[in-house]
Amino acid sequence: MLRLVYDSLTGNVRHFAETLAAELHVSPMRVQDPAPTDAYLLLTYTFGSGEVPASTRRLLTTHGHLLRGVVASGSYHWGHNFARAADVIAAEYRVPVVAKLNKGGTAADRAAVRRWLLHYAESAPPFPTSCTGEPTPWNAG
């Protein structure tokens, strides 16, 4: 199972991440916690008129290579900028947008993210592989 790493300003993403984590029997991490050392799903918010929060950027700058998907919250009233942080991060790090949440999200949103996580867990390679194709102790060739 991917680690859940979240960034929250108003508490909406925190509540979504903690509720999802409880349903999955895992412990979520905040972006302010010690950085993840394994693959993770990022749950974040959209700042201003569509920006990625600075705290999320700091995590991605050093640990973006471990990112496997992104969930972002926003508000429908922002129109085309709704949860735009998800689109920006997905494009920059070439990962899927798993979900866009209106404010705190819904039970249906949690179910969709949970399904994606379970599918990812079933289809992910069983051992680490190098992003560059170089042999590692697990895929010596």
Swiss-Prot record:
- An example of a Gene Ontology BP annotation on this entry? protein modification process
List keywords of the entry alphabetically. Answer: Plasmid
Q: Which GO terms describe its molecular function?
A: FMN binding
Q: According to the lineage, what is the superkingdom? A: Bacteria
NCBIfam families in the record: nrdI
Job description of the protein = Probably involved in ribonucleotide reductase function.
UniProt family annotation: Belongs to the NrdI family.
Concerning PANTHER family, the annotation shows: PROTEIN NRDI (PTHR37297:SF1)
This protein is called Protein NrdI
